[in-house]
Amino acid sequence: AMTVPGTKALVGYSGIYDLEKAAITMKTKDAQRIAYFCDRDPKVLREASPINLIPKKNVPASMLVCGTCDVTVECEQSEMFASALKKKGGVCDLLTYKYYDHNVSSKTSDKMEEIFFKSVDFLTTYMK
């Protein structure tokens, strides 16, 4: 979304935004996962990381959702991305759910409906 001209808004759920710093990328010993992340090639990871793709102007409004107990993709990924977006002048709503894991927005979560409606409201506001 960051590289598509005219993008007005982005909503991210439990996302990896800096592949070079994500625990799922750097700490895994799983060969399949390592291969999925291009054998951890720093150049590829840097070029594919949304945190490095934020435009210099017209930063899309963003809403990021994460759970503080996410062991799949640490919540710090969303926190770092939110900070970087704001530094570039973007609007970013960071919704952090204490004690929730990677499935904070899944259909099994008691927060699913709340997050869905917050997403709709956010997109309705910024897609005008």
Label every model-predicted segment.
Residues V11-S14, V65, Y97-K98:
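Alpha/beta-hydrolase-fold catalytic nucleophile elbow
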Residues I16, E20-L53:
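Mobile cap/lid helix-loop segments that gate and shape the active-site cleft of serine hydrolases
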Residues A23, C75-E76:
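Conserved catalytic-core motifs of eukaryotic protein kinase domains, centered on the activation segment
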Residues P50-V59, E76:
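Conserved serine/cysteine hydrolase catalytic core
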Residues E76-K128:
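C-terminal catalytic histidine-bearing segment of alpha/beta-hydrolase fold enzymes
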